[in-house]
Amino acid sequence: MDSYDAPELTPRQDASSRLKDFFVGATPLQKRLESVRKQTSFIPTPPRRKIPQGSQLQEDVDPQKFAFLLHKQWTLYSLTPLYKFSYTNFKEYSKLLNAFIAAEKQKGLAVEVGDDFNIKVVFSTLMGVKGTQRDPEAFLVQILSKSQLPSEHKEGKVLWTGWFCCVFGDSLLETVSEDFTCLPLFLVNGAETNTAIIGTWFQKTFDCYFRPLAINAFNLSWMAAMWTACKMDHYMATTEFLWSVPCSPHSLDISYAIHPEDAKALWDSVHKTPGEVTQEEVDLFMDCLYSHFHRHFKIHLSATRLVRVSTSVASAHTDGKIKILCPKYLIGVLAYLTELAVFQIE
């Protein structure tokens, strides 16, 4: 096992005030969901979860169809159900959103699409990105730059990408009527200013609202355990943990890198429940890491805050950033993120 102190990281800046203003508004639907939440008992974190597995629905689709979702950093949001949303209206939505972005730029608002504003908005379905047949189809929204040459029919580079999905979202699907489409997890790669403008259009069009989805240290520990438990044909990355040490005048970060086979051996030594991960096993796994680190460096990691986890399956940061690396476990990663998103909006 290898360990080292990482240089201080610059804290992520808060989202723009425009982004904040949009993502905290309460819609009539949110008020109804809040009413339902108050009438139901609090549901604690499940004491056990299944180890992520491959999805048959995903296997039935050409892997190249969603390969572009991998190895990119996505910012996470939770999303309340969309009112009167229709998959058959994608062409109309593309035109309306394109016009809305053009109008916002004409107002002088910050839109990061280039000076010539020669863009195209595209809505499309992401087949296979779901946990069960009952889950709504995932869909993708992209802002593309148009080619400047009339003879060129190829699309230009992707300026902004966002996708909406629901993976094993039964708990939310059971609480809303047929007028609503439940896609509680929204993932974005692109400028925050564009995210705010596109989010505003969705809010006005579908009576929904977005909220940044942070990942606390407790959930990062679960991710570390579940992803370490996954069987890999070959490991693509070192298993790494990053802890933040609050101190004055500046914070200190501690990075702890472990060979993935060593991490898997450690997990196997504490894992007793076939096919599942339990809270007790997660705690034991993390306690073993803390003990090993303290034995070598005399530092109590339990007094710090876990802020990032990286494995060959995926990496996640407490500020709501995720990067999915292994296509086999794409659905498994999204299932847990959907669970967190549903919990945030219920």
From Swiss-Prot:
Phosphothreonine: residues carrying this PTM: T45
The protein's name in its UniProt record: Centromere protein L
Pfam families named in the record: CENP-L (PF13092)
Biological classification of the source: Eukaryota, Metazoa, Chordata, Craniata, Vertebrata
Family stated for the protein in its record: Belongs to the CENP-L/IML3 family.
GO CC annotations, alphabetized: inner kinetochore; nucleus
Major subcellular location class: nucleus
Role played: Component of the CENPA-CAD (nucleosome distal) complex, a complex recruited to centromeres which is involved in assembly of kinetochore proteins, mitotic progression and chromosome segregation. May be involved in incorporation of newly synthesized CENPA into centromeres via its interaction with the CENPA-NAC complex.
